[in-house]
A protein has these predicted regions:
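Sequence/structural signature of beta-propeller modules
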Residues: 1-145
Length: 147
């Protein structure tokens, strides 16, 4: 079976009112862009060969204390392979807390890529190091949700 080029999409679903990561969509876009420019690929069976997007669905709640990554799901009639990621809630107020969030996201994505056997041009560690460098170029307020 040949390698299939895939892309990453990140979305968020929050289960509790007022409980969410207070970061701008710009953080998720940066992560998606950096991952997607690295020619992600995986081997898919003939039945799954139409899929070309890994959809990471991020959630948090006051009850989540550890990083948890769900089993990849293959919705019918969809291009997506959905992966649910539960991350511990972090109050993102400064660079340190933003980098902690990014490290947690890196751990979850690395686990998912390993499980799906996704290949990349660069290591996930190198990709996330470049993400952190980009994040630190801007003041923290650039990356936070505007009130």
């Amino acid at each position: 079976m040949p390698l299939k080029k895939v892309f990453v999409n990140i979305s968020c679903i929050y289960l509790e009112k007022e409980i969410f990561f207070k970061i701008s969509h710009k953080v998720y876009k940066l992560v998606m862009d950096k991952l997607n420019e690295n020619n992600l690929s995986l081997v898919l069976s003939k039945e799954q060969s139409h899929r070309d997007v890994i959809g990471f669905i991020i959630t948090t709640s006051t009850e989540i204390n550890t990083i948890a990554v769900g089993v990849p799901k293959y919705p019918k009639n969809s291009r997506f392979i959905d992966v649910n990621i539960k991350l511990p809630l972090i109050n993102i107020i400064d660079n340190d807390s933003l980098l902690l969030f990014v490290n947690n996201l890196k751990e979850a994505i690395t686990f998912s890529f390993d499980k799906l056997k996704i290949g990349t041009n660069q290591s996930i560690s190198n990709i996330f190091e470049s993400i952190k460098e980009e994040l630190l170029k801007e003041d923290i307020t650039y990356w936070l949700l505007k009130k």
